[in-house]
Amino acid sequence: MLAKELILASSSDIRRNILEDNGISYIAKNHNFDEKILKSDKTLSPDNLSLQLARGKAMSLKDEFINHVILGCDQVCLLKDKIFSKPLTANKAVNNLSILSGQTHQLIGSYVFIKNGDVLYLSLIHI
């Protein structure tokens, strides 16, 4: 049986480093949430999209980690009204960077903590 550690619903090295740098004990587990449906819903605001993605990632692990606090995170990059998804290829990354270069854009970060399917805390940060 696992100790009741924080479960990080992510494989992100950056998110792992943040927890480690702050002395937080955790178990990292890839989420199994399909983001495509939410990302294709054009009625969601960028804030709501980011929050729902973070929540979905955490919720996808609730049955596997009963009585654990699970942290789901997401970040949305926004330039004017266009949302930039995480580039899956080097060419797409270069293209995105060339579009964003010199432009004022926003990063919207969402963090959702759940336990047994209940949201304990959520935060939305604009950078």
Set out the residue ranges of the language-model regions.
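A short beta-strand-loop structural module common to alpha/beta enzyme folds
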Residues: 27-35
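Flexible, glycine-rich phosphate/dinucleotide-binding loops
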Residues: 15, 35, 120
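N-terminal beta1-alpha1 ligand-phosphate binding loop
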Residues: 2-24
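Anionic-ligand binding patches
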Residues: 3-6, 20, 41-125
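Cofactor-binding loop segments of dinucleotide-utilizing enzymes, especially the Rossmann-like FAD-
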Residues: 11, 31, 116
